[in-house]
Amino acid sequence: MLIQLKNLSKRFDQKVIFENVNLEIEAGQVVLLTGNSGSGKSTLLNIIGGLERPTTGEIFINNRDILKLKGRERADFYRRQIGFIFQDFYLHPQLKVSENIALAGTFANLKSAETKHKVELIAKTLHIDSILNHKLDQVSGGQAERICIARALFMSPKIILADEPTNNLDPTNAENVIKILRAIATSMKIAVIISSHSQMVASYADRIINISQGAIHEISQTR
């Protein structure tokens, strides 16, 4: 099992965000997290990705207890195992597309030729190789989202976490992005976890997990 969450709870002061969450996710699965605003979808993604810590509970990735990792070992683990796609892109406006993609490997000690090769390979897969020398003011919203996906893939992660990845896109580009994530999960055996309210996203997910009132209330298989 790629991801195991055991009795995971998160509280802010006296407010319970979620409690005693138990969940297993396999490689190659697309998992959709749904729920009302403030239900804990983004918080759960952030905890899996190491941006926040749970109040209680355990997280295992590839049978490794990741909450026990410290310092450099912890940073290296998250950098290599997990790629993020954020709602607001978080791309550097002064850098070229190729440089934005390569930012994910800043601390990987890769040679420049290896970095260039990886960027070109990923960009070709995502059909953005023709814009690698462009600045961000020259790309569309759909292309910007593909750049984010390319950056998330740069370190060859086992997991991609996507927080509302289609919110800033028109319906056509939104569906194209989800199709790409679906294909990546299948072909690369990457677990893709998406938080979204979109019914369209649900149609591409293997599992739909609803978070409500601090708990997982429904887990349904859709494929």
Segment roles from a protein language model:
Residues 160-163:
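Catalytic Walker B motif of ABC-type/P-loop ATPase nucleotide-binding domains
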Residues 65, 102, 113-131, 179:
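Conserved ABC ATPase "signature" region
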Residues 49:
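Helix-to-loop junction immediately C-terminal to a conserved catalytic motif
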Residues 3, 18-20, 77:
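Conserved structural motif at the start of ABC-family nucleotide-binding domains
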Residues 135-139, 143-145:
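Conserved ABC ATPase signature
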Residues 156:
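Conserved catalytic motifs of ABC-family nucleotide-binding domains
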Residues 95-104:
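Short coil-to-helix segment of the ABC ATPase nucleotide-binding domain corresponding to the Q-loop/switch region
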